[in-house]
Amino acid sequence: LNPVRTFIENKYLYERVSAEENMVAAMRVLRRRLDEGGAISITAGNRGRQLAEAPFLGGVLRLATGAPALARASGATILPVYTLRADDGSFDVTIGAPLTSQQSNKDAYAKEIVAQYADQLAPYVRDFADQWRGWRYTAALDSAPLDSGSAA
């Protein structure tokens, strides 16, 4: 893990759960924290058993559906967080609008959450493209669409 990124987290962190070795076990721990009323933080990415895609800056954004699945199963609210480095070297942190869905189907739920996230993320990436580290989660519109069982 990057010490620059984890330095501030470590001041407030109860526990770090890594999915590097066992994603299923990590998700169980996160679900338990939610069931206990805790807050969790998940970095958006495309590592997971299922992906959902949404239109994004003329292409598509492909993300793992683990966070939406946890939110749906537990009733938790997803609050996206956007962090930008300011000119003076400090960081500006913005908590976005809650990502919500009334979809009863888990795949439709995840797709709607990813679409809302993509819509909220787009202005930050458009205005601060040099600071975004998620380009690897994007694809051109003409690339192959996901099938229902895609994995990272």
Where are these regions (language model features)?
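Catalytic core of membrane glycerolipid acyltransferases/transacylases, capturing the structured
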Residues: 1-21, 49
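Non-catalytic C-terminal accessory region of glycerolipid acyltransferases
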Residues: 10-11, 23-152
